[in-house]
Amino acid sequence: MGTKESTQRRAQRVRRQIRKVAGERPRLSVHRTSKNIYVQVIDDAKGHTIAAASTLEKDLKGSLKTGADTAAAAAIGKLIAERATKAGVKEVVFDRGPYIYHGRVKALAEAAREGGLSF
């Protein structure tokens, strides 16, 4: 089994567990690359993205040193919490995908919790 296949299997395993516990709550999905981090609040029942944020946004790009550190992830966490709250979402299910809960993923999650999202 190659790296790509094992990554996809890990992500599917996490999402399967999320579907069991989610109920009606939307999913806070994280995607991480070596240079940036992206996050979306997704309503799986309707198939719509409620809110999204990334380190590629123009207003954030100038204020961040890089898009690939924990400070950038924390800024994105606060931003997604603000946007989700504005859209009327208070409770979400955290979808870390194939990434372990450590470093940038953990910083994003903690900042989103501080911003008002509960999961």
Curated annotation (Swiss-Prot):
Gene: rplR
Membrane-spanning residues: none
The keyword Ribonucleoprotein is assigned to this record: yes
Keywords, ordered alphabetically: Ribonucleoprotein, Ribosomal protein, RNA-binding, rRNA-binding
GO cellular component: cytosolic large ribosomal subunit
Record's function text: This is one of the proteins that bind and probably mediate the attachment of the 5S RNA into the large ribosomal subunit, where it forms part of the central protuberance.
Name recorded for this polypeptide: Large ribosomal subunit protein uL18
Subunit structure: Part of the 50S ribosomal subunit; part of the 5S rRNA/L5/L18/L25 subcomplex. Contacts the 5S and 23S rRNAs.
Database matches in Pfam families: Ribosomal_L18p
InterPro entries on file: Ribosomal_uL18_bac-type, Ribosomal_uL18_bac/euk
Family: Belongs to the universal ribosomal protein uL18 family.
